Amino acid sequence: MFGRLTRFAGFADDASLELYLRLVRERVLPVVRAIPGFSGYLALTDGERGEVLVLTLWASEQQMRASEETTVQLRSQAADKVGATVLSVERFRVAISELDIASG
């Protein structure tokens, strides 16, 4: 399994952060779920710093790399709509994975 970690900054307030999260739920995730190899999505927020970390998980490195063109566009569009910027995008091999996440 492989992961792509994206750091966004520039969320001016809670409203812009909530708008971003809504865009992800309504527009980004439906597209990403359809990409072969997609295995998961986590968004971590820090309202005080106006930052979001997004981790997408992929079944293989090849599938993660193949998703780049689509995900670059989605990232840019979502950030632009809320006045945020993409600070960095990094790729990793997942060494350990254990998720048991309750909604909320």
Kindly give the residue locations of the regions a language model identified:
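Short S/T/G/P-rich N-terminal loop/turn motif that feeds into the first structured element of a domain
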Residues: 1-52, 59-72, 80-104
